[in-house]
């Protein structure tokens, strides 16, 4: 299953360009991983979430909390998919979504979902570079009274993000590291 995910990422999510891409962190890179090509395609998302629930959580020693949540939009489909995989086991594990900015109407909440049902959460992200988006989500969860126990991501670009998140007190467990892809073409 993990090998199939790696192949899907290389085939559908990985891009190389002589003209560097601007990453969410603001950094520039010729190597771009658009994991939404995995998470927004139903059969690929299903495989990813099935792998996370059936293998990655146990292999990494990740605690099974009451929720999985992260910053919109990278985490959204992953959190929903994980929740649905747990429903197949008759377990309610809630998806939580962290807004980038609070709304100026309604409840003005940054964290959406069954927050009143949740005391602990595994933070989720698709790709980690500097860790800035994940740290924003962790802080918003904590401000909402939720304990972030650990984290998962599809890909660690190995550019310091894991250390920055660990400095926030959260250990991340990536499914893949950039180095897992070997010598990427055009290195």
UniProtKB/Swiss-Prot annotation:
- What keywords appear on the UniProt entry? Glycosyltransferase, Magnesium, Pyrimidine biosynthesis, Transferase
What catalytic activity does the UniProt entry give for this protein? orotidine 5'-phosphate + diphosphate = orotate + 5-phospho-alpha-D-ribose 1-diphosphate
Q: Which residues bind orotate?
A: 129, 157
Which GO BP terms apply? 'de novo' UMP biosynthetic process; pyrimidine nucleobase biosynthetic process
Pathway this chain belongs to: Pyrimidine metabolism; UMP biosynthesis via de novo pathway; UMP from orotate: step 1/2
Asked if the keyword rRNA processing belongs to this entry, the reply reads: no
What's the top EC group for this one? transferase
Which residues does the record give as 5-phospho-alpha-D-ribose 1-diphosphate binding sites?
99-100, 103, 105, 125-133
Q: Which InterPro entries match?
A: OPRT, Or_phspho_trans_dom, PRibTrfase_dom, PRTase-like
Which Pfam families does the record associate with it?
Answer: Pribosyltran (PF00156)
UniProt GO molecular function:
magnesium ion binding; orotate phosphoribosyltransferase activity
Subunit field text: Homodimer.
Family affiliation: Belongs to the purine/pyrimidine phosphoribosyltransferase family. PyrE subfamily.
Q: Can you name this protein?
A: Orotate phosphoribosyltransferase
